[in-house]
Amino acid sequence: MKNKTHKGTAKRVKVTGSGKLVREQANRRHLLEGKSSTRTRRLKGIVEVDKADTKRMKRLLGKA
């Protein structure tokens, strides 16, 4: 049987040209009044998926 792409993962994770996986930071969608500006600033931008999770993520994306 063919492997299928896990659509929830596909919406959250992108593969870069060099094959790295990047994702957005969590905790920056709502209820921001209670979070400090330092914290929300730190959560800005995209980060690389942790090395421990990369193999599993690639399998969910149908890349391996």
Curated annotation (Swiss-Prot):
- Enumerate the Gene3D superfamilies for this protein: 4.10.410.60
Q: What protein name applies here?
A: Large ribosomal subunit protein bL35
The UniProt entry's GO biological process terms, in alphabetical order, are: translation
Q: Name one Pfam family in it.
A: Ribosomal_L35p
Query: Which portions of the chain have biased composition (kind: Basic residues)?
Result: 1-14
Annotated region (Disordered) at 1-29
Q: One Gene Ontology cellular component annotation?
A: cytosolic large ribosomal subunit
Query: NCBIfam families, per this entry?
Result: rpmI_bact
Sorted UniProt keywords? Ribonucleoprotein, Ribosomal protein
Q: Which family does it belong to?
A: Belongs to the bacterial ribosomal protein bL35 family.
Instruction: Say if the entry is tagged with keyword Ribonucleoprotein.
Output: yes
Which top-rank group of organisms is this from?
Answer: Bacteria
Query: Which GO molecular function entries does the Swiss-Prot or TrEMBL record give?
Result: structural constituent of ribosome
